[in-house]
A protein has these predicted regions:
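Hydrophobic N-terminal alpha-helices or hydrophobic patches in metabolic proteins across all domains
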Residues: 1-121
Length: 121
């Protein structure tokens, strides 16, 4: 299945780098839960990577809906963006939203600033 075919599908993700954990080689802190889809193969020969957004605590496993594919132009290691299946989310590029964390709830909706997502890649 092509990575774009995951959009709109319910996906099971195994988290191997929890929210707040430190990257094993580069030393940065993960602002989101990060994992992979077991038993899949991506362009880099490993499992397909996923960012889990909208979950505010470290987790081990997650099932949610794929809303986007982040295509990296310098390699074949695309990332899927997975969210809780029962929530509404909006990607915004606005300086008017200055969250304490990369994710903020406003009027019952989740806003994920594009800058926060880009910084985590």
């Amino acid at each position: 299945m092509a990575n774009k075919d995951y959009i709109g599908k319910i996906i099971g993700v195994k988290i191997d780098r929890e929210l707040g954990s430190k990257h094993p080689k580069h030393g940065f802190i993960y602002p989101v839960n990060y994992g992979f889809i077991p038993n899949t193969i991506s362009g880099d020969g490993e499992e397909i990577d996923c960012y889990v957004l909208g979950v505010f605590e470290p987790i081990k496993d997650f099932t949610g809906k794929c809303i986007a594919v982040i295509h990296r132009i310098n390699d074949d290691d695309d990332k899927l963006v997975i969210i809780p299946k029962d929530k509404n989310y909006f990607l915004v590029n606005s300086d008017s939203i200055k969250p304490d964390s990369p994710q903020k709830i406003v009027n019952g909706n989740m806003y994920l600033p594009l800058r926060a997502i880009a910084d985590s890649i």
